[in-house]
């Protein structure tokens, strides 16, 4: 394969992996530990 193809595939794979990890952190099991500042502020 050409160098440009390998670079494009590796950058795309990294971007997809980062997006998957961000979604898992936001909505998956670790999201239970995130604090909600709107619930802490009682009006």
UniProtKB/Swiss-Prot annotation:
The membrane topology term of the UniProt record is: Single-pass membrane protein
Q: Which family does it belong to?
A: Belongs to the PsbN family.
**Major site of localization recorded for this protein:** plastid
User: Would the keyword Plastid turn up in this protein's UniProt record?
Assistant: yes
> What are the subcellular locations of this protein?
Plastid, Chloroplast thylakoid membrane
Carries keyword Plastid?
yes
Q: Which domain of life is it from?
A: Eukaryota
What's a GO cellular component annotated to this UniProt protein?
chloroplast thylakoid membrane
**What protein name is recorded for this chain?**
Protein PsbN
Q: Name one GO biological process term.
A: photosynthesis
Free-text function comment from the UniProt entry? May play a role in photosystem I and II biogenesis.
Residues annotated as transmembrane: 5-27
Which InterPro entries does this chain map to?
PSII_PsbN
Q: Which UniProt keywords apply?
A: Chloroplast, Membrane, Plastid, Thylakoid, Transmembrane, Transmembrane helix
